[in-house]
Regions:
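Helix-to-loop junction immediately C-terminal to a conserved catalytic motif
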Residues: 60
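Catalytic Walker B motif of ABC-type/P-loop ATPase nucleotide-binding domains
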Residues: 162-165
Length: 263
């Protein structure tokens, strides 16, 4: 079942974003409102160009909104946030630092106690199957391993909220499945709120408590679907009738909006 304390950690209120271009203004987001409650896993699912990543960057305080507000713990976000972890599609590791040292980069930037931070970093690497790879450099790691290092780096300071921008997009199907399982365990153990951008319908249903379905540009919320599947979830849940029903419900929304076309 979904984890929901009833209190919104993150509230996005009437958010719009308009970019100025040589051809005139382009509206990327149009009056988007949603809440992510404490401990929830919320996925944002939609077609390319619908403003999913822009929404995440505004929630992180990295991009200003044209109108509307992002409220975190009752306070309006007006600058880049330091209370979160963030993971991008590309791991962005430093080639000259080992896996452990890349994770520790977050701790160094925040001036955390090195001994305690290193213990956390090693535990995180162990929890995602990278025990024995702590001293390997990025070029010695597979794409999936590098992304695991990136996730560990985002968590070493123990944030209460994790923002993820298509973190599995460049990975093969089997690696995506394994990292999804790893992420589910990390989320469950830490009881953090996750805002997860993805193109994958199956990924969204498997991981989420709520799936926010976006329309094509300008990005609006088409529907918010609560996913009531037992936790912890195994890959076998994808074979159930309930999983298929959620997938069909979302697919029908994309057919109705013209994102998908049949015949």
């Amino acid at each position: 079942m979904s984890r929901d304390s009833g209190q919104a950690l993150l509230s996005i209120q009437g958010l719009s974003k308009v970019y100025a271009t040589l051809d005139g203004p382009v509206r990327a987001l149009d009056h988007v409102s949603l809440d992510a409650r404490r401990g929830q896993f919320v996925s944002i699912l939609g077609p390319s160009g619908c403003g999913k990543s822009t929404l995440l960057m505004i929630a992180a305080g990295l991009v200003p909104a044209s109108s509307g507000a992002v409220i975190v713990n009752g306070e309006r976000v007006a600058r880049p946030r330091t209370d979160i972890g963030i993971v991008f599609q590309n791991p962005v590791l430093l080639d000259w630092r080992t896996a452990l040292d890349n994770v520790m980069l977050q701790a160094e930037a925040r001036k955390l106690d090195r001994g305690a931070a290193e213990r956390k970093a090693r535990q995180l690497l162990f929890s995602v199957g990278l025990e024995g790879f702590e001293n390997k450099y990025p070029h010695e790691l597979s794409g999936g391993m590098r992304q695991r290092v990136s996730i560990c780096r985002a968590l070493v300071h123990e944030p209460h909220q994790l923002l993820m921008d298509e973190p599995f997009g460049a990975l093969d199907a089997l690696t995506r499945d394994q990292i999804a399982l790893d992420l589910q365990k990390l989320w469950n153990d830490r009881q953090m709120t996750v805002l997860f951008v993805t193109h994958s319908l199956a990924e969204a249903v498997f991981l989420s408590d709520r799936v926010v379905v976006m329309t094509p540009r300008p990005g609006r919320i088409d529907s918010i679907i609560d996913i009531d599947l037992p936790r912890p979830r195994t890959l076998a849940v994808r074979d159930t009738a309930q999983f298929a029903a959620y997938s069909r419900q979302i697919r029908d929304l994309f057919l109705a909006s013209g994102v998908l076309r049949e015949g």
